[in-house]
Amino acid sequence: MKKRTIIFLTITTLICVIFGILIIVHNTHTDRRYQSENISNEYFHSDDAVVATVNDNNITNREVSLVKYSYHTKDALDKAIEQKAIVQLANTDGYKLSKTDLEKERDYINNTYEKLNLPDNEKNQMFKEDLIKNHLEMVTSIKYQNQIKMLILHQEFCCDDELINKEYEEYKTLYNEWEAGGKESSKLYKQIWNLREKIAQEYIQKRIEQLQIKKY
């Protein structure tokens, strides 16, 4: 059984490495509209017109242009709405980035901005601050979602949705079964992983649906 688990993990690792290489190659040859130089141009050619709201928190064209850069997506408006919504859920739950994370992410954007070699003026400083704001929202969104997954993993998750709770009970049963078997079943591990991802996604989506979201 251990041999099969080792083989499965080895194959999975190889697939991840290959997939990672493909992503790097893709990003190296990616559409130029997703490069920071071009996003800065798009940002400056965008306006502050409100294109959507999430619980009365506005999303402007300029914010959408930054989200397009952050996620390399054509569906930037929908992604901007999702990001804004998840950040609001994080705020409601009292989730915040650590001081270390804040400093690290700010340094990352400052370094990215410096590479653009833009003149030091008020307009460019506003662009820089918006870059930082959007990036911190993106990181908050990602880390908050990971926190939900960790709560499920450690069986500390709670929810008032009947269907999600049913899936959560199934998850706990599978996890305990996997643990009782010495954590050797790769098949059970895959089921547990997929179910955890599914529960976290459904839980967040259910809460997003309760927010007031409008597109203009």
Spans of model-derived segments:
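Short, low-structural-confidence N-terminal segments
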Residues: M1-K74, W178-Y216
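N-terminal targeting/tethering segments
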Residues: R32-M138
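Well-structured core secondary-structure elements of compact alpha/beta domains
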Residues: N61-E82, K128-Y203
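Charged, solvent-exposed alpha-helical segments that act as regulatory interaction surfaces
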Residues: L118, H154-E162, E209, I213
